Amino acid sequence: MAGHSKWANIKRQKAVVDAKKGKTFTQLSRAIILAARSGVPDPSGNFQLRTAIDKAKAAGIPNDNIERAIAKGAGTFGGDNASLEEIRYEGYGPGGVAILIEALTDNRNRTAADLRVAFSKNGGNLGETGCVSWMFDQKGVCVVSGVVDEDQLLEASLEGGAESYEMTEDETAEVFTEVANLEILNQTLKDQGFKVTDAELRWIPSNHLEVTEPDQARSLLKLIDTLEGLDDVQNVTSNFEMSENLMAVSFA
């Protein structure tokens, strides 16, 4: 998972930069709208909304924008947000790498067309529903920073119902659990004094496809970057494994 985790770290850093440019404001705002619409529009009683707000704040989105998105989701602001729907798309990248795309859109035809263009221009192809999703399992993931004692992390993770954890970089770990247990794990880790910087649902590949060829690596990372740059796209997950050196050279 080292290569894939490195890519996750790059994406988190990139999201902050992109948000400051205004690129991800739409994506994060839509996530808040959907969360507020799906449950109570109060973050204290809606874990999905609370985590969406935390991500927006971490990316530097102003409180006024966040409050406006909550109001839109609650139906108290105006505008047609009922048409927003969650859709999962699937496809193949260069070399047969499996790719899952989670989108939030008010026009599925537009989204599918944008995705198809992105795939075709970068050596991949958009597939049918179910073509690659069987290669992934959805899990809850807590990203924990400032981990200086792995034994304490293990004890707290087990207490919170975690299945496993992985150290991804210096003093940072990802703790995995069942989807329904994410909120409990998140709270348990915080109660034990750990700093949880992110809590999210993530698709985890059951097997990884090793990428070693530089041209394939460049095309693949360009494809993923292009997909993530689309306003309707919320998350992109793939099953590639790549050395950090190759990733750094290809992503530069």
UniProtKB/Swiss-Prot annotation:
Recorded GO MF terms: DNA binding
Primary location class: cytoplasm
Localization of this protein: Cytoplasm
Protein's organism: Nostoc sp. (strain PCC 7120 / SAG 25.82 / UTEX 2576)
Protein name in the entry: Probable transcriptional regulatory protein all4276
Key words, A-Z: Cytoplasm, DNA-binding, Transcription, Transcription regulation
Xref: SUPFAM superfamilies: YebC-like (SSF75625)
Family: Belongs to the TACO1 family.
Gene Ontology annotations of biological process type: regulation of DNA-templated transcription
Keyword Repressor: no
A cellular component annotation (GO) from this entry: cytosol
Lineage: Bacteria, Bacillati, Cyanobacteriota, Cyanophyceae, Nostocales
